[in-house]
Amino acid sequence: MSEQGGGVKRTGLGMMLAFWALLIGLGTWWFQGWFEARENPNAHLAESLDGGPLTLERNANGHFVATGRLNGEPVTMLLDTGATQVAVPADLAERLDLPRRAAASFSTANGRVRGHLTTLEEVRLGGLVARDVPGSVVPGLEGGTVLLGMSFLGRFELQMRGDTLTLRLPEKGKG
């Protein structure tokens, strides 16, 4: 009977360990999703075909971050009205095989850096699409995030209210 009791104890211990492992795994998965949603509340934008208005939510750090596409590749974008062009990290530009044109110097939050001018065939944010967008390949951009500058944003009307930013196609007949 003592052997039988030991087997039950081992089974109970195994089930308890499996329960805790499952609980820790689920907790980690939930926390990771929660953290990602705080950083990029616009990760799952619908790609509508009509080019209708797109409303983005500000993230926990006060920035507008969204998942979009560069030449068909899904990327994380930080909307930056202070950037003249769409700035692409050098490693992402390499992966997308972006053409590197003239060398240029760029002012960033971390000082001046040397990079190259490029042209992006297509930039997509939700249902908003722009083609032949001037861009720059910038070494040293952290985290693989694309800075979505005015060479894209300037093609749309922007309206900010509270913690939301709405982008829409300009009305016909306006500037």
Locate predicted features.
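Pepsin/retropepsin-fold aspartyl endopeptidases
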Residues: 1-76, 81-175
